[in-house]
Regions:
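A short, N-terminal "cap"/entry segment at the start of jelly-roll beta-barrel domains
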Residues: 1-35, 116, 120-136
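Conserved short histidine dyad/triad with adjacent acidic residue
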Residues: 23, 36-53
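Short histidine-centered beta-strand/loop micro-motifs
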Residues: 29, 47-53, 70, 77-78, ...
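A short hydrophobic beta-strand segment most commonly corresponding to one strand
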Residues: 39, 58, 86, 100-116
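Glycine- and acidic-residue-biased ligand/ion/polar-headgroup-sensing regions
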Residues: 54-67
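A cytosolic small-molecule/anion-sensing beta-strand core signal
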Residues: 62-63, 80, 99
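Short acidic-glycine-tyrosine-enriched beta hairpin
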Residues: 73-90
Length: 136
């Protein structure tokens, strides 16, 4: 069993801070459970372009408001508390933030915890080496 508090990862390599958002990765590929979980805060007034070409991501909005723009289908969705969106088709998208959005993000395959988006909004696919025999 793994039990962690958000403060356990704050200020560590699993706490990634950028101009538009910061993310604290609570469960990562290092935990070897097949997915990762993080809390991300998208900053008010920011516009963020993302494209998870290597991952499926589920996002659950806990607080804040904004818009999700699906670049592939030219469709805009309103975001607020209780909203979930699932990027299951590697959709290019943009999040426009009206008030700080706090969300819980789940990735498959799991992220290692240090990823940042490249110039295309993509996380690289970083994988851990397999555990030595008898270590699993």
């Amino acid at each position: 069993m793994i039990v962690r508090k958000i403060d356990d990862v704050t200020g560590t390599r699993n706490h990634v801070d950028t101009p538009g958002w910061f993310s604290r990765r609570i469960v990562t590929a290092h935990d070897r459970v097949g997915f990762s979980v993080g809390e991300t805060v998208l900053r008010a007034g920011s516009t963020n372009d993302f494209w998870y070409a290597n991952h499926v991501e589920a996002v659950y909005i806990v607080s804040g408001e904004g818009e999700l723009y699906d670049k592939d289908n030219d469709t805009t969705y309103q975001l607020g508390p209780g909203t979930m969106y699932l990027l299951d088709g590697n959709e290019k998208h943009q999040v426009r933030v009206r008030s700080d959005i706090t969300c819980v993000c789940v990735f498959n395959p799991p992220i290692v915890g240090t990823e940042v988006h490249d110039e295309n909004g993509v996380y690289p696919l970083l994988e851990l080496p397999p555990e030595p025999a008898g270590q699993a």
